[in-house]
Curated annotation (Swiss-Prot):
Name assigned to this protein: FAD-dependent monooxygenase phomE'
Keywords, alphabetical: FAD, Flavoprotein, Monooxygenase, Oxidoreductase, Virulence
Subunit structure: Monomer.
Family, as annotated: Belongs to the paxM FAD-dependent monooxygenase family.
Active-site residues per Swiss-Prot or TrEMBL entry: 158, 196
Biological source species: Diaporthe leptostromiformis (Lupinosis disease fungus)
Transmembrane segments: none
Positions of FAD binding: 3, 277, 290
Top class in the EC scheme: oxidoreductase
InterPro entries: FAD-bd, FAD-dep_Monooxygenase_BioMet, FAD/NAD-bd_sf
Pfam families in the record: FAD_binding_3
Length: 396
């Protein structure tokens, strides 16, 4: 595994892991308690201008409907546990060797090799490129058809606050709700504030999105910071006084622009395949950026297991796209609009999903959360292997 960072100073905030992704993590023996994961039992969409609840049960009965809870987890805690599972000697398969401070500067899809910044050339049976929204690997796949990611007009601020800071303040103590995610809207969809706990409900995570932030001096680096007073300056225009009191506690605020790209027609070429933001960058409105990358990893893990002949790789990658590309493309479309998602956007997403109707928010949640990438991948592989056995036996 080639990683351009040092992995020594990981930063970030929390993310949500919806049932479609949590089933994968649990299958990998991720232990929620070891990462301080919070099972989110309730969710609501609230008019942030007057604090009226618009949709009280946005994620109602997650466990009974989809068999698994929705989790919130600090991304550093999740990364730490995933890295341990990948590199430790215990467990199935060979431990992964992580080569840090190695930035890839060029890809060769046909030769299955990469060149790093220091001139080192590395070869493999298959390159799995997870190089983000500004992927350079995507040009190897699409050639001159490549479409660069661009500004969306949206920017976001993120911060974390210890729960005790709210509980010790009479003005905010009553607003703390364990195991709950809340989405506050502003007038005209100009902004949104997402609030949920992480780290065993001991830390509150905030994501403030808007098209009205001054982004003239803001880049895409999520490590960039602004003064803690900046979120409140905007919140005074967007939200009710009660919510302003919450935003006032912001500290160590990170601020960056959000970029996106529409769906692309293919995710692989020769012996190079795109995953994650390199394949399907999306905004945060469905909370599926990380979840879709997890689905990518799960599908590839199953489809490439016990491949002993390079000649099998192409067929397996075609299966990967069959399982993942239309779904990832639909999620891109659904994710790039402030919820609740309008019917026109649901219709555009449904064009990628033959046999599925997305007539309501409930339809969207049902499609997104009920999908079992593990079962889909195993079933597709079983069909392929059955055909291969029949062919080898001489019946075809």
């Amino acid at each position: 595994m080639i990683e351009q960072s040092s992995l020594l100073n990981e930063v970030g905030a929390a993310i949500t892991i919806k049932p479609n992704a949590s089933r994968v993590l649990l299958s990998w023996d991720i232990v929620p308690e070891q990462s301080g994961m919070v099972a989110l039992r309730k969710g609501s969409i609230i008019d942030g201008t007057n604090m009226q609840v618009l949709i009280p049960d946005y994620y109602k009965d997650s466990e009974s409907k989809w068999g698994l809870p929705m989790y919130a987890v600090h991304r550093v805690d999740l990364h730490t546990q995933l890295r341990l599972l990948a590199t430790q000697k215990e467990g199935p398969g060979q431990p992964c060797d992580v080569q840090v401070r190695s930035k890839v500067v060029s890809y060769d899809a046909e030769g299955a090799k990469v060149t790093t910044e220091n001139g080192e050339v590395l070869r493999a049976d298959l390159i799995i490129a997870a190089d983000g929204v500004h992927s350079t690997a995507v040009k190897q796949v699409l050639g001159d058809e490549v479409v660069q990611a661009g500004d969306t007009g949206w920017a976001c601020m993120r911060w974390l606050v210890p729960s005790d800071d709210f509980l010790s303040d009479p003005q905010t103590a009553h607003m703390i709700q364990d195991s709950t995610t809340r989405y506050f809207t502003a007038a005209g969809g100009a902004a949104a504030l997402v609030w949920y706990p992480c780290r065993n409900n001991e830390v509150q995570n905030f994501l403030y999105l808007s098209r009205e932030f001054d982004i003239s001096h803001v880049g895409e680096d999520f490590r960039a910071r602004v003064e803690p007073s900046v979120p409140l300056e905007y919140a005074k225009k967007h939200f009710a006084t009660a919510l302003q009191t919450v935003v006032k506690k912001a500290n160590q605020v990170k601020f960056w622009k959000l970029v996106a790209r529409g769906p692309i027609p293919k995710w692989h070429k020769d012996r190079l395949v795109l995953i994650g933001d390199a394949a399907h960058p999306m905004l945060t409105f469905q909370g599926q950026g990380g979840g879709q990358a997890i689905e990518d990893g799960a599908a590839l893990g199953i489809l490439l297991d016990n491949v002993h002949d390079r000649g099998e790789i192409e067929e397996r990658l075609q299966l990967f796209e069959q399982i993942r590309r239309n779904r990832g493309s639909a999620l891109q479309i659904l994710s790039n609009t402030n919820p609740p998602v309008p019917q026109s956007v649901r219709d555009a997403a449904a064009e990628y999903l033959p046999g599925h109707r997305l007539s309501s928010t409930d339809d969207v949640n049902e499609y997104v959360f009920s999908f079992d990438v593990l079962a889909e991948s195993k079933a597709a592989l079983a069909i392929l292997q059955s055909k291969e056995r029949i062919t080898k036996s001489g019946f075809l």
